[in-house]
Amino acid sequence: MKISQLFLGLVACSTAFAYAGIDGISSNESNIKIGAAANASHPGGVAAVSVQAAGAPYNAFTGFSSLKGLAQAFAAQGTSNTNVTVGSKTFNISHIPVSAMPPSHSALGNFNFGQVGTQEVYFGEWWKAGDTPASASHTVYYAGDNTNTTVPTAGTATYTVAGINGSASNLLSGTFTANYGAGTLEGTLTGTGTAVSSLSLDGVAFNPGTAAFAGLATANGTAGVDNSGVVQGQFFGANASALAGIAQFDNVSYNTAFGGAKN
C-alpha cells in the first residue's frame, strides 16, 4: 500500500503507539518496536527498543542508554558515540554497525540513533545485517519520556532539528517553527552525504492535548523528488521543550528520523 494512502489512518491512530510513560513509533514493528521496559541485563533510562526481527532471545527490550554504552564500548571495532552541535544545540549520536559487533550481538543489526540533549528523547534508524539503508528492512523510529509533557496553546517557537537518514556522520539539520495557537508545525531539513538532501514538512498539524503531530512531507535526494511522505511525531517535556518524529516515503531510502530542541 502506498504511503500516501496510509496518511488518514496514521493521523487517526496518532496516539495508538503510546506506552506507559513513553510515546514512540516505528515505521515497521516487525523489525523494531518501541517500549518502556528494559530487561534486567540491559537497563538504563526509560525509553527502550526491541529488535523484533532478531527473534528470541535477542528481541528483549533494551534501554537506549544501554545501547549508548554499547556504542562506547566497541569504539575500537568501529562503533561511535559522540556529541554533535547543530546550531546552538547538542545531540548525542550513536553509530552501531553490525560489522563492529561480536557474534553474540550480530543479530541486533545496524543502529544509528540520536538523543536530544540530555532529555530522554531518542530518534534513529535500523536495518538488518547484510542489508543497506536502501533496503526494505530500513526502519525509522523515535521514543521519548512523556512524563510532565505540556504544550502551549498560544504563541510560536522555533526548534533546532537534526535528522538521521542512512548515516550517523552526515546529519540533516534545520529549523522547525511551531505555531501553538494554530496547531501547526513547519520547516525544512537539509544535508549532504545522505539519500535525502532536503525534507520539508507539508501541512503538519498537532493537538496540544495529546502533544502528537502528523502531516505530509516532501523529500528530494538521490532518487529525485518524492512527495509521498507521511510525518508523525510528538512533543516532549514541559512547554514542549523537545520534539521527535519520523517521515516515511514510498522510497524507503528516504525514510528519516528527526529530533529537535526548543530555542
Swiss-Prot record:
One of its GO terms (cellular component) is extracellular region. This is Hemophilin. One of its GO terms (molecular function) is metal ion binding. Disruption phenotype: In a mouse pulmonary infection model, the mutant shows a small decrease in bacterial lung burden and systemic spread. Residues 1-20 form the signal peptide. It is found in: Secreted. Contains an N-terminal clamp-like domain that binds heme and a C-terminal eight-stranded beta-barrel domain. The loop containing His-42 undergoes a large conformational change upon heme binding and release. It comes from the Bacteria. Monomer in solution. Interacts with host hemoglobin. Induction: Part of the hemO gene cluster. It comes from Acinetobacter baumannii. Part of a high affinity heme acquisition system. Functions as a hemophore that acquires heme from human hemoglobin and delivers the heme to its cognate receptor, HphR, facilitating transport of heme across the bacterial outer membrane. Apo HphA interacts specifically with human hemoglobin and steals heme through a passive process probably due to its high affinity for heme. It can also acquire heme complexed to human serum albumin. Plays a supporting role for full virulence, acting as an accessory factor that enhances the process of heme uptake. Keywords: Heme, Iron, Metal-binding, Secreted, Signal, Virulence.
